Amino acid sequence: LPGFTTDVTEFIDGTIEGLDLRRLLAAHWATRPEAEAIVVVVNGRNALGGSFYVNSPVTGRWEDYTVADVVPWVDAHYRTVRGRDGRLLAGEGMGAFGALHVAMRHPDAFGAVYAVGLEAFDETGLEDLGMATRPALVKAWFIEKERMALWPAADGPARLADFARELYAADSRGFNGLRGSAYAYGAAFAPDPGGGPPYV
């Protein structure tokens, strides 16, 4: 499962430290053909940047999508080892949280789990990132929430998606990316679908 704002294509186009998963696996299988596997990269991105692979009334049912849609589709279209003993769920960053979350909630579907890059999810992770402790970030969030309250209700979801897209386009890894991730995190773990944009 990819991390926050990571596109599935980044696993094969070299964006992630030159990684091309296709070449890596081909080289591995050339020396160990008995270690066959089907690798599926599940898209967990949404309009706010990431779903955290949880079900949310604001951003959708990402846990269900992973377990109830992706797994059966792969089993129906490929020669798989069906059942939990034939499946490993792995993830990085947001995807690491998702892998642990989904695998623990669905032990009947996944027999193994691997997670890397969970820094944001430890006891002080959000503080260490500055998501809740940077005064400028907190101030910007409240100012933006007041502005969003003025949007016509029917335009709310589309305008919020545009707002998030602009944040990430301006600075996906810095301050603006942190602002966007705060909205995505809130929509996943503290959703308020009736509260208007940003729905947290």
Language model features with spans:
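Non-catalytic cap/lid and distal C-terminal segments of serine-dependent acyl enzymes
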Residues: L1-V200
